[in-house]
Amino acid sequence: MAREFSRADRVAQELQKEIAIILQREVKDPRIGMVTVSDVEISRDLAYAKVFVTFLFDSDESAVERGLEGLNKASGYIRTLVGKAMRLRIVPELRFVYDQSLVEGMRMSNLVTNVIRKDQERYVEEE
């Protein structure tokens, strides 16, 4: 019977949980601040993982850059802690990337809201 999710998907999901816990409890770099792991994409051979993150201070681009720099500098340490927490033959090499999807989703939502508001104003003026 075929599984609903591949092994890579299951490992990515577990990796997301472990990295979130590690970032919350273990990493003390002040550049990182409040970070959320939104998604993890892992290669089929489980050797590389792209970790998508968002920050509490999304509006400040320089703070986001500093946060990503801190995360990528700490990726070796995080990888070591992940290796201790998960039983994997090969612990994936971690690369942290800022997740633009939430910002883009909010921008699209604001555009739709503005169009609806303008349409309602125009409808009221016509009556």
From Swiss-Prot:
GO MF: ribosomal small subunit binding
Pfam families, per database record: RBFA
The protein's name in its UniProt record: Ribosome-binding factor A
Gene3D superfamilies from the UniProt entry: 3.30.300.20
Function: One of several proteins that assist in the late maturation steps of the functional core of the 30S ribosomal subunit. Associates with free 30S ribosomal subunits (but not with 30S subunits that are part of 70S ribosomes or polysomes). Required for efficient processing of 16S rRNA. May interact with the 5'-terminal helix region of 16S rRNA.
Cited PROSITE patterns: RBFA
Ubl conjugation listed as a keyword: no
Record gene name: rbfA
Upper lineage: Bacteria, Pseudomonadati, Pseudomonadota, Gammaproteobacteria, Pasteurellales
Keywords: Cytoplasm, Ribosome biogenesis
Quaternary state and interactors: Monomer. Binds 30S ribosomal subunits, but not 50S ribosomal subunits or 70S ribosomes.
GO CC aspect terms: cytosol
Localisation per UniProt entry: Cytoplasm
Family: Belongs to the RbfA family.
GO terms (BP aspect): maturation of SSU-rRNA
